[in-house]
């Protein structure tokens, strides 16, 4: 049986994203789209699809469908990597810039509201604990 902590963390992520999702509705972005755009914006420029999939925590085939949709909307471009022709580099387009600004403002405002009443020290402790949990899980996965 899963520990209550795992369920609590999963529920927290689900309701956190649902709140942001609701607030981003006017921008006509699905959760998959805004999570992908947010990660592209946060990562260093010209990330590969593989790096982006890892950052988001999804499989590459799922990401490709989302990137196809974002490319159709003119929000990203993909270019073949010079050093590896099988790899694609992802870039936000100029058309995406105002949308990203609005999206990031909504996300930042929502995060600030969610974290209201939590001190900087408490937040730092939480971040440290989450990093430790992630490290332990990655080590356990590596062991098989």
UniProtKB/Swiss-Prot annotation:
Q: Which family does it belong to?
A: Belongs to the SlyA family.
Q: Any keyword Membrane?
A: no
Location of the HTH marR-type domain: 2-135
Question: Alphabetically, which GO biological process terms does the record hold?
Answer: response to stress
Reported function: Transcription regulator that can specifically activate or repress expression of target genes.
Subunit text: Homodimer.
Q: Which Pfam families does UniProt cross-reference here? A: MarR
InterPro entries in UniProt: HTH_MarR-typ, MarR/SlyA-like, Tscrpt_reg_MarR-type_CS, Tscrpt_reg_SlyA, WH-like_DNA-bd_sf, WH_DNA-bd_sf
Q: Which SMART domains match?
A: HTH_MARR
Name the species this protein comes from.
Shigella boydii serotype 18 (strain CDC 3083-94 / BS512)
The protein in question is named Transcriptional regulator SlyA
